[in-house]
Amino acid sequence: MKIDKRLMVIVAIATLFRMIPFRLKYLVGSDPYFHLAYIEEALKAGEWFNFFTYAGGPWGLQVRLFHPLGLWATPAYIYKLFSFLGISLYTAFRVTPVIFGVLTVVFFYLSLKKLYNRDVAFIVGLFLGVNYGHIFRSMANYYRGDNYMLFWYSVALLGIALGLKTRSKYRYLFYLLPGIATGFASAFWQAYYPIFVFVLAGGLLLGVYAYLKSPKLFLDSILIVLSTGLGVLIANILGDKVGYGMLGYTDWMGKKVAETFGLEFGFIKDAYLLIHVKYLLPLSLVFLGFLIITKKLNPKIKVGVLVGGSILAFIVMLVKFPALKDLSTGFGTFREVPISETLPPTLDDLWRAYNIAIFLAALYILRLRKIRSGDAILLGYVITSLWMLRYWTRFLFTAAPAVAFLSGIGVYELTRRIKENKIRITSLGVVILLSSAFSLGEVYSVKPFMNENWEKALIFIRENSNENDIVLTWWDWGHFVTYYARRSPVAQGSPNSGVAGYYLGLVDNGWAQSLGVDYVIVSLYDILKFEAIVDTAKLSRKWENISRADYGVDFLKLTESTGSILRFDSQYSTLIVKEGNIRVILSGKVVYPREAIIESNGRIKNLKYPARSGVYVYVNLDYGYAILANEKAWETNLLRLFTQRTGENYELVYSDGGFVKVFRFVHPNVVFRGNKFILTGNGTGLGLYGYLDNGTLVFKKWYSVKNMQEFELPNNLNGSVVVRYVYTQGKIVLDRGIVRVKN
């Protein structure tokens, strides 16, 4: 077997770029920490259990309602496969994204080699190998599920390429591969659905190509479209085994989308799969049938028929099925949620992801004079992925190969017109080096959110709290709590308006008590997200009228230190500290704060002034920063706790002096130890709800515990593996949580 040296070069470059973050001690982002925590606990338990008690506090989290099992099983089996080499699970987990990211590049290379030629494949492979938009979610230390979807699409594309270009009477069998790939993609990520659209769009555009230029390819087009039906069948079968996607029949989003489209779950138990089978697949076949019927028309008339028919079909589809207009945005999912991933990309986002490839993509126009069947297939993916990119920054990754295809093919078309071989090679080298340099800078600039400050604080909680304790922290850090503290956070993975309201002081301690909160984390990182906290609180109708303008918070860095004089600056204000005398310069006007808190060497010094400025100041001398706030922000729970102006319900148990602080929330509490509930406070009732691992409620009973200090778990819980408990005094909830029952 002859070694493809060009492919080896691409593999080496793609691997090198994606392994750069491996040098980092911590994982990138926050989601990977949840995934790794679950894998570790599952391997420890010896089974892929469903009910995870270290997440989703105080209720617990059913992981089968989160992602399909393949997302967690893959790194685990890679670890088991290579454990004989002495690699740890942590290492295996960190390199898994690289493995599938590089494999994606490889399969795209092989596909383009079939659809075009080895030169096109090589240039596109180089562009994709150094494309930061693709690197970001396929690099070491950053484990994300969409990496698998693009991998399976690259497999599907290879199957289509083999079907189109193989000279054999059995070539049509290759069209089983896109069906298998789309189906298997469902086992690895909850939002795998775009792969169906990519394959379907490719089949439809191949049908258009067949209509205009090569009628013999109609059968290929139909088989590609039908392959997605096989994918639906496989995805539906796998769903019963490893869990459905985010539009599954047990998920609230799946129920909502099904209701919107007037669908009922039956044999097919996923809303998107139902939409695909009931609407997208039949409509696509009708469209292809229309093209086949009119294929013998005059070529000029055919163009008019195609354009007019497409417009008419699009209008009819939107009138008859108006909800389909939201298909590209996940049916409106997260439309109002303040997450950067679900906002449209900015020009800066596009430049960071693709750099010069954005401009080089325009060169694809040189290819339009001689469109071939391979172009039709690729354009199906390119058009749909770029359309998705209009809506969400998240799709910078999904569209990365599309940009690489356009720019790579465009550069090939340009350079092949250059007759001088040295100039052609030099030009290509300069372009690739430029793109590589920009991407290299972006990869090296990647920094984890996790750091030693967080790690020490969370390990403290793990070592000094009870297993059933609940932790309140901002949702961005919730997965950190699950991994390092092995405790259940109230919010993680998605915005929580209740937690935002708590930090802003819009709810009282009774709210936290009703959720069983035992520890509250406040940090400088939360204060830096103050505007996001306000925006998240506004998601609740109760607080939709609050405004960022109501809460004034400014972060200032130490910029000058001369003797006893310290100067702190931000874009908007200046703070001068001199021997306890503090002045604030706002818009050129000098004012004095009403209250100032100075933290240094673990001590808090509170200074009050007879000023009426409405300005409040926190100064941290150890870490060299200051916080400026107006009265409304100053009196929020977040700043009251961070500046240690707490009431009797909060006890500071950990502080690093200025980054992360942990408070124990003092309230009537339940501790689960040795199959016994140890009760504190004057509670009168204890409700127990037992569940099987699949989430079925099999036990429910209330007990009177008045004047009791402990309560032993009943022996017969009807096979329950986890128990949710509620500790009450009359109708008031004193504590709440979830425990795993030990045999």
Curated annotation (Swiss-Prot):
Q: Which GO terms describe its molecular function?
A: metal ion binding; oligosaccharyl transferase activity
- Write the Enzyme Commission number(s) for this entry: 2.4.99.21
Where are the membrane-spanning stretches? Answer: 8-28, 92-112, 120-140, 145-165, 171-191, 192-212, 217-237, 273-293, 303-323, 346-366, 374-391, 395-415, 425-445
The enzyme's first-digit EC class, named in words, is transferase
- Where is the short sequence motif WWDYG motif located? 474-478
Residues spanned by motif DXD motif 2? 144-146
Could you say which residues are annotated as the site Interacts with target acceptor peptide in protein substrate? 31, 336, 529
Topology feature Cytoplasmic, residues: 1-7, 113-119, 166-170, 213-216, 294-302, 367-373, 416-424
Pathway(s) this gene product operates in, as recorded in its UniProt entry: Protein modification; protein glycosylation
Q: Where is this motif: DK motif?
A: 526-533
Gene3D superfamilies per the record?
Answer: 3.40.50.12610
Question: Which GO BP terms apply?
Answer: protein glycosylation
- Motif DXD motif 1: which ranges? 29-31
Chain ranges on the Extracellular side, renumbered to this chain? 29-91, 141-144, 238-272, 324-345, 392-394, 446-743
- Cofactors named for this entry: Mn(2+); Mg(2+)
Q: Which GO terms describe its cellular component?
A: plasma membrane
Subcellular locations according to the entry: Cell membrane
Q: Which residue numbers does the motif TIXE motif cover?
A: 333-336
**Entry remark concerning the domains of this protein:** Despite low primary sequence conservation between eukaryotic catalytic subunits and bacterial and archaeal single subunit OSTs (ssOST), structural comparison revealed several common motifs at spatially equivalent positions, like the DXD motif 1 on the external loop 1 and the DXD motif 2 on the external loop 2 involved in binding of the metal ion cofactor and the carboxamide group of the acceptor asparagine, the conserved Glu residue of the TIXE/SVSE motif on the external loop 5 involved in catalysis, as well as the WWDYG and the DK/MI motifs in the globular domain that define the binding pocket for the +2 Ser/Thr of the acceptor sequon.
Q: What is this protein called?
A: Dolichyl-phosphooligosaccharide-protein glycotransferase 2
The source organism is: Pyrococcus furiosus (strain ATCC 43587 / DSM 3638 / JCM 8422 / Vc1)
Encoding gene, per UniProt annotation: aglB2
